[in-house]
């Protein structure tokens, strides 16, 4: 605090051993500082240590930099005894598990214990999208591995009540219900958990240390464009998939709020993009309306991540603005005049409120068709802040953003505005009111819009690239 308000040096010079990577014999050390030009010297057994990965994480207070955190991954040898860290020639105290230590004997004991625990893992990879729904990156990567690497032991976590369950079972997926004891047994035995989400039912399946000696590969649900650090920093992520250079740098780079570095973050693209590009359909006449959710409108969390209904939802600006647009005569006239079908598929959390919208009969609301099919068969998308716009950018199809609640959205969500500027970096016009949205939509249908080029570079073998990263 004194450093922030009076620009005084940090008086407590301590380095912490935060984490142990028992698979690679590496430890994560961190310390805090305010002088970005400070000099660091790290010695292992009196020899200059080789830094495997490093990161400068930034903490802000009142829109100003509060302090910095240096995060460094070091490689240990079996007989490493001492670790000495110097900042501007001043030696730092070393703390591990809330204890000051003079050598690495305790660290090596914990390392050996974790190795022993990891040795009990079988070569099983557990996949998951949402507990009650598939059709995301985990499904696509699982299918690739099932078809191209059949010897790899795999299982896919999915509720028996899911509408995707029978479809995947017929295809040959090995499915396990998250409510059963067998699911917990497989979590215990698995070596890798590979998921597009970071749900508690996985991370806490066997208690807080469920994934301590297992690899968690985060496939992501979409492309991160906002600052999700407050949420994601709570999780242990061993491999963090990203899709664009800007996204990669915003997470793995220095002077941001994420704890993750080049050790965890990799740039591959999303697993589902292989099939997306392959199955793209041109010259269609379909408008896909796909707004994201507002977490602050959610009901209480029930088991397995399912939300209860919020009785106040219909009073929200979100409901009122989308209903105004969807039920407008102007939208219907445009659809009829230009011969377009309109599909309304909002975030899955909206599904329980669909009847409240009282939509006209010509608007289709179906969750039976896969997300992939919707993107491929649609000719343009209307969304708000959702990263699904990147799917259309990959397919080089136009997007409109409807952001009537811009200030409220970023003020109330668990994440802050990130590197992505919708007006500068987005894939189409940003509209802030109903009239502007209709005007921009008419321009696109009239072919009077100015198309924005997508800067997304796509690999031809994304699933193959991710599989290689999972094998590491």
Identify the residue ranges that each predicted region occupies:
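Conserved catalytic-core segment of nucleotide-activated headgroup transferases in glycan assembly
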Residues: 135-150, 271-356, 429-431
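A donor-sugar binding/catalytic signature common to diverse glycosyltransferases
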Residues: 195-200, 214-218, 369-413
């Amino acid at each position: 605090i004194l450093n922030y308000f009076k620009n005084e040096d940090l008086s407590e010079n301590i380095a912490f051993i935060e984490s142990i990577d028992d698979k690679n014999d590496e430890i994560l050390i961190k310390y805090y500082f305010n002088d970005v030009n400070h000099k660091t010297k790290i010695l292992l057994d009196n020899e200059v240590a080789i830094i495997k990965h490093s990161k400068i994480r930034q903490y802000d207070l009142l829109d100003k930099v509060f302090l910095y955190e240096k995060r460094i991954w070091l490689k240990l040898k079996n007989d490493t005894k001492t670790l000495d860290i110097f900042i501007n020639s001043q030696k730092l105290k070393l703390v591990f598990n809330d204890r000051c230590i003079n050598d690495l004997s305790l660290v090596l004991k914990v390392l050996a214990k974790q190795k022993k625990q990891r040795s009990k893992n079988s070569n099983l990879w557990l996949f998951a999208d949402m507990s009650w729904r598939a059709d995301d990156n985990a499904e696509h990567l699982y299918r690739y591995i099932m078809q191209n690497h059949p010897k790899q032991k795999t299982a896919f976590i999915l509720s028996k009540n899911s509408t995707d369950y029978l479809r995947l079972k017929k295809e040959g997926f090995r499915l396990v219900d998250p409510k059963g004891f067998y699911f917990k047994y497989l979590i215990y035995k698995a070596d890798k958990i590979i998921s597009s989400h970071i749900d508690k039912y996985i991370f806490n399946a066997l208690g807080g240390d469920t994934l301590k000696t297992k690899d968690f590969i985060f496939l992501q649900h979409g492309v991160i464009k906002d600052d999700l650090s407050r949420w994601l920093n709570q999780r242990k992520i061993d491999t963090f998939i990203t899709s664009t250079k800007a996204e990669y740098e915003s997470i793995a780079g220095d002077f941001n709020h994420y704890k993750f570095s080049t050790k965890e973050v990799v740039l591959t693209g999303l697993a589902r993009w292989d099939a997306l590009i392959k199955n793209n359909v041109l010259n269609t006449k379909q408008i896909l309306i796909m707004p994201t959710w507002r977490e602050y409108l959610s009901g209480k969390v029930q088991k397995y991540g399912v939300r209860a209904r919020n009785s106040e939802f219909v009073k929200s600006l979100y409901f009122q603005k989308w209903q105004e647009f969807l039920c407008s005569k102007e939208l219907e006239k445009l659809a009829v005049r230009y011969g377009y079908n309109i599909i309304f598929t909002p975030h899955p959390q909206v599904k329980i409120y669909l009847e409240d919208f009282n939509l006209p009969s010509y608007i289709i609301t179906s969750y039976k068709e896969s997300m992939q099919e919707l993107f491929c068969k649609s000719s343009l998308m209307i969304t708000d802040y959702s990263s699904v716009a990147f799917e259309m950018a990959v397919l080089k199809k136009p997007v409109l953003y409807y952001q009537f609640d811009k200030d409220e959205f970023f003020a109330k969500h668990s994440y802050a505005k990130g590197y992505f500027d919708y007006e500068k970096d987005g894939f189409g016009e940003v509209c802030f009111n109903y009239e502007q949205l209709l005007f921009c939509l008419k321009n696109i249908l009239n072919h009077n819009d100015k198309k924005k080029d997508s800067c997304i570079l796509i690999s031809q073998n994304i699933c193959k690239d991710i599989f290689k990263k999972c094998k590491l």
